[in-house]
Every structure is written in C-alpha cells, then in structure tokens.
Regions:
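Acidic, Ser/Thr/Pro-enriched low-complexity segments and adjacent helix/loop capping patches
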Residues: 1-217
Length: 217
C-alpha cells in the first residue's frame, strides 16, 4: 500500500520519521523550480541510494539533495513499500537515517549561524593543508574539491558549485568550515603571507652564506 501526501502538510523529516525502518522507495516530486523528481531508497532504517530522475547521485550530490528536501515546504511525496533495487556496484550509501537527520539538522542550524559570515561566491580559496582528517559531509566535499583548491589560482564557491553540481550557498558553507579548521586561506591573503616570509628566508640565506665565507677565510 502506497503512502502519499503533500510536503506542505508533512515535511520530509516527518515523513522519514513516520516510515521508521520500513523498506521501499520514497519519491519526491512537483518541486518548485525542478523538472526532475527525486527517489530515495530506504531499507531497514538506512538510505541505500538517491536518484535524480534516473541518475544515481554520488554521496556529495545525494547529501546536497537531501539537505534541500529537508527544508522544502512545497511538493508532494509517495512511498512505495518493498525491497528497493540494489544500487550500481560501489555506489551504495548505507546511511543510518537517524544519524543523517541529526547531521542535516546540525547543518541547517549552522547555515543560519554562519549566514552573515559566508564568503562571497567569487572569493578564491587555496588549500594550505592537504593531508587532513575531516568528518562527513565535509570530507566528501574536500575529496571532490581538493584538485581545484590545490591549484595555485585556487577556486571560488561559484566555480566549485558549477563543477560539482552543488548550490553556491552550500559550497560557501563548506569553504567557511574548512577555513575555520585552518585548511584554506583566501588566495590573496595566502600570497601576502608568502611574500612576508620571503625576505625572512632571504635574510637567513645571506647570514648563512656570510657565516660560511667567514669560516673559509
């Protein structure tokens, strides 16, 4: 038996909470500004995969979609009970629902807390540490964004959003978190720091050379 309704009457977190550990596919459709519907495969209290239309989303894109659906108050849903089809090999998520809902709630709270501190979408950042440990979902974002943030020119939220298929605001949030953790710096500030250190290094080299020359005389 299918369960269906409107997101105006019941939000996605409430729908998922109601479903509990049931297995099946939850379809969300008729979303404003979206042509495609989304499907979420649930099995025993875990998210198995997320699809946009017929495309299975990678973990970073899946989290982005779920975060968007988490806050939306428009659209409709329908849950069809049963065992969902398995995901393509290597693309299974296996996320516990309770932990996922807690993470999304935390991110939503941080969105509001950081709203006035998020960087401009055009500000470019560069990685200052590449060997780092991060918790999800920041780790998934870092793994996707690292090749662009490790370049000498760095990358902006605007550019990363286009390359990774995410929203500008979401990318700005991740960049802000990475900057707070000391993993990124704005490109201009990073270059200024290097320029400030250059004379110190040159002075040290001169002193070492002078010392060596003095010993040989």
């Amino acid at each position: 038996m299918a369960i269906f309704g409107s997101l105006k009457d019941m939000s996605l977190p409430d729908v998922v909470g109601m479903l509990g550990r049931r297995s099946g596919v939850l379809e969300v459709f008729a979303l404003p500004g979206r042509r495609q519907s989304f499907a979420i495969a649930l099995e025993g209290g875990r998210v198995i995969w997320v699809k946009e239309g017929t495309k299975v989303l990678d973990p970073l894109q899946a989290r982005s979609v779920l975060q968007e659906l988490f806050r939306t108050q428009e659209g409709a849903f329908e849950f069809s009970a049963g065992t969902p089809s398995p995901p393509p090999e290597g693309q299974g998520l296996g996320w516990p629902l309770e932990r996922l809902l807690l993470t999304m709630t935390t991110i939503e709270d941080e969105y509001h807390a950081y709203s006035t501190s998020l960087p401009d979408p055009k500000t470019r950042f560069r990685a200052v540490q590449t060997d780092i440990w991060l918790e999800e979902p920041l780790w998934s974002f870092w793994e996707k964004a690292k090749p662009f943030l490790s370049r000498s020119a760095g990358a902006s939220a605007e550019e990363l959003a286009q390359r990774l298929g995410l929203r500008d605001r979401e990318v700005a949030y991740y960049l802000h978190k990475l900057r707070l953790a000391g993993k990124l710096a704005p490109v201009r500030a990073y270059e200024e720091t290097l320029n400030e250190r250059a004379p110190e290094k040159q002075g040290l080299v001169r002193r070492l050379l002078a010392s060596l020359l003095g010993r040989t005389r």
